[in-house]
């Protein structure tokens, strides 16, 4: 389970090449002090540079953001991808994988991380 609770808590991907990477993140916000305590959301990010990219922003004040799904698909060629939890001060490395073209790094709540090949078959599990 990945939960963001602080005003600066974000999930970032660090990529080592300019090959295209399509990223989808879905989550649920828990705001117990409101009439609608659970609000789902999603973010889609296209990465096309060797860079550090925030793929999930910090939650609003008094909100816990539970990550449900992360998918990062290497569309344009091989790319080494590092997943980081960043609290505004320190980057905590979660994992690093090298994706071949067409492969997808996937996180699913309660299942953890895996890599899928270009056909969608599970390749590895961390």
Q: Predicted regions: what is each one?
A:
Residues 75-95:
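Short, surface-exposed beta-strand/strand-loop-strand elements in extracellular ectodomains
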Residues 9-13, 65-74:
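A short beta-strand element within beta-rich, extracytoplasmic domains
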Residues 2, 14-16, 61, 74, ...:
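Sterically constrained small-residue positions within well-ordered secondary structures
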Residues 24-29:
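Short Gly/aromatic-enriched secondary-structure transition segments
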Residues 1-6, 49-50, 61-63, 85-86:
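A short linear-motif detector with a strong N-terminal bias
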Residues 15-19, 33-64, 77-81, 119-126:
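Surface-exposed ligand/attachment interfaces on beta-rich extracellular proteins
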Residues 1-9, 89-126:
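Intrinsically disordered, low-complexity Pro/Gly/Ser/Thr-rich segments with frequent PxxP/GP/PP motifs
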